[in-house]
A protein has these predicted regions:
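Intrinsically disordered, flexible peripheral segments
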Residues: 1-163, 168-183
Length: 183
């Protein structure tokens, strides 16, 4: 199953009780993904600081250039849409099979593999940004790159077994001219 939502609060992913409980036990179950990650000055391993900065559109490129993405509002303050959360969930029966004593450990690997393949397809085929053409009109151009994080959880909010992966797609992409802009 797949559900989607806007990322509206960084702390939801980092501080929620059930997220924190699962993350303490499963430190290797989170990672950055997407081809844009290679152009950014971040550790390939997941960490809270890089996750927070990517959500807020505060990016340092591998060349050391600092970029702050967003649009200025009427008060002159920068506003940035953090991105999207795509949540890939295994069926309940599969989650139970995986999490029971002596459960099949291949299930989590299969969930990660399927999620990564789907995310790669989305990145290649559905990643766009806006650009002004010579006449000043705004048009969409395909970029084929983004940055994301994969956060595995085995519990839902009710602390029931529910294997799922949150794919947070950050609101940033690299245009063909090399500039990093919002999706």
């Amino acid at each position: 199953m797949l559900s989607t939502s806007n990322i509206s609060d960084v702390n939801y992913y980092l501080n929620t009780k059930y997220f924190s409980l699962a993350r303490e036990q499963l430190l290797d179950d989170k990672q950055f993904a997407g081809s844009l990650i290679h152009d950014l000055l971040i550790d390939q391993k997941f960490n809270k600081e890089d996750f927070t900065n990517l959500c807020k559109g505060k990016i340092t490129t591998a060349n050391g250039e600092y970029i702050e993405l967003g649009r200025k509002n009427k008060d002159g303050e920068l506003e940035h849409d953090m991105g999207r959360d795509l949540t890939f969930s295994a069926p309940k029966s599969v989650s139970l099979q995986h999490n029971m004593e002596g459960g099949d450990k291949r299930i989590k690997k299969a969930l990660f593999t399927a999620t990564k393949e789907t995310l790669d397809y989305i990145e290649r085929n559905y990643t766009f940004t806006r650009i002004k053409d010579e006449s000043g009109k705004i048009k969409l151009i395909k970029t084929g790159n983004f940055s994301a994080s994969l956060l595995y959880e085995n519990l839902n909010r009710n602390l029931e077994f529910d294997d799922h992966i949150h794919c947070t797609i950050f609101n940033a992409t690299k245009r063909p001219d090399g500039n990093i802009r919002s999706l």
